């Protein structure tokens, strides 16, 4: 491994106010590193410090700079003196955009903006958060996926899925053609679950909240792998320091497909009465197809019927020495954090 001791320069984390970003900050601070993170506006800085302190990390080793992925200002200051950059920030649409480029262009250009700044200021390695969305959305029927698989953004896919594939491809192309000595490693998790550190919920954690509150009495038969947010954070740290990680992408997940109904059963069996409102039934494929005529959410689910993706995580285990938590632990810890922070409406 690199000689990266806590006394060396700061590690830059983009998007430290986000769900994954806050866990990456926490993991770095707990490991004794000095950390610099970016926020889009100054009013987010205090919340980032408060979250770090609440998680038990030392916010005194945390520096915050303002830099927006949509503008050049601030990035030279952000990367100055850093050997490593963990590029975690990426746009996630709160609603369906009017045009797919509203999501695709900011994701691609933001990644390139970070990479250019890193190259120009002598950063050794960038670890970029991509997604399984960039890996496994162009095959029907599921099956086993590894790092050689790629999603084709020319397919009929959601803007978010396309954005992950386009941004990651652009990052690899830039590094090969213009990166100079800059190294790139990429982390590709599926849906990220696990405990929240503050009251701002990701879409995936919001799904668990909805299950606990009874907002989803039934769920479609959708299958997917799960990554624990703490495991994804650790994968970033290991990819940052492991020499063999340079030039590689890593699938991060349990390696076993679960389903929405399977998650509901984990909640019911693990929490008893506290999960009394969890989904009690899984829709049949026929019900999904019928509902897809009028329900946009079911329309997307209908396109996934019969798809059971399995992620091969052998490379992450072998190269990074990484091991995932179980789905049960991840789901129950997600719920536990929601109850602890008072985020579940009775």
Regions found by a protein language model. Give the residues of each.
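N-terminal Rossmann NAD(P)H-binding glycine-rich loop of SDR-like oxidoreductase domains
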Residues: 3, 9-33, 38
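NAD(P)H-binding glycine-rich loop region in Rossmannoid oxidoreductase-like domains
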Residues: 42-43, 47, 53-109
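Mid/C-terminal beta-alpha module of Rossmann-like enzyme folds, strongest
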Residues: 5, 235-300, 318, 332-346
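Conserved Rossmann-fold NAD(P)-dependent oxidoreductase catalytic core, especially the SDR/UDP-sugar
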Residues: 87, 91, 96-160
């Amino acid at each position: 491994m690199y000689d990266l001791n806590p006394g060396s320069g700061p590690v830059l984390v983009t998007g430290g106010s986000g769900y994954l970003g806050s866990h990456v900050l926490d993991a770095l601070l707990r490991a004794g590193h000095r950390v610099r993170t970016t926020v889009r506006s100054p009013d987010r800085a205090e919340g980032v410090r408060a979250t770090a302190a609440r998680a038990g990390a030392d916010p005194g080793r945390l520096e915050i700079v303002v830099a927006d992925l949509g503008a050049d200002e601030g990035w030279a200051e952000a990367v100055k003196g850093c050997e490593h950059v963990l590029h975690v920030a990426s746009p996630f649409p709160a609603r369906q955009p009017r045009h797919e480029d509203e999501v695709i262009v900011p994701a691609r250009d933001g990644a390139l903006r970070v990479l250019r700044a890193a190259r120009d200021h002598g950063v050794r390695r960038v670890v970029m958060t991509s997604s399984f969305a960039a890996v496994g959305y162009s095959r029907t029927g599921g099956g086993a996926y590894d790092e050689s698989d790629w999603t084709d953004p020319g397919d009929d896919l959601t803007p978010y899925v396309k954005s992950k594939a386009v941004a990651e491809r652009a990052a690899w192309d830039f590094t090969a053609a213009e990166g100079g000595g800059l190294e790139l490693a990429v982390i590709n998790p599926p849906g990220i679950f696990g405990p929240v550190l503050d009251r701002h919920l990701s879409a995936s954690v919001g799904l668990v909240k909805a299950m606990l509150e009874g907002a989803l009495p039934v769920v479609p038969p959708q299958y997917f792998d799960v990554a624990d947010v703490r495991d994804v954070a650790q994968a970033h740290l290991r990819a940052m320091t492991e020499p063999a990680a340079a030039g590689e992408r890593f699938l991060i997940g349990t390696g076993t497909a679960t389903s929405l109904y399977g998650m509901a059963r984990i909640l019911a069996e693990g929490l008893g009465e506290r999960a009394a409102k969890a989904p009690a039934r899984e829709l049949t494929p026929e019900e999904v197809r019928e509902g897809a005529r009028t329900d946009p959410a079911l329309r997307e689910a209908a396109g996934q019927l019969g798809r059971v993706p399995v992620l091969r995580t052998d490379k992450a285990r072998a190269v990074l020495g990484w091991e995932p938590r179980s789905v049960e632990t991840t789901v129950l810890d997600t719920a536990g954090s929601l109850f602890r922070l008072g985020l579940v409406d009775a």
